[in-house]
């Protein structure tokens, strides 16, 4: 059965991601031990005016840094726009085609 890493290791991974150049913020980090290795995921917030390519490059760099500095098999990253509401989680989007939209 898998389990999360200890708080110290999770904080260290968070710090590594947060210190990646051009990452504005990090949230929703999840970790799992897989044997003696770590599988993690994180939402990274980047400047909303960047291109998709630039946002992807930042996420790739965050992943590289985590895999280099920690016993990580993988870091799955989700790129979110910085300082914008997260419309994916918790908010209801109103359909513009509806009579009330």
Residue ranges and their predicted role:
Residues 1-101:
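Alpha-helical transmembrane segments and adjacent TM-loop junctions that form the membrane-embedded core
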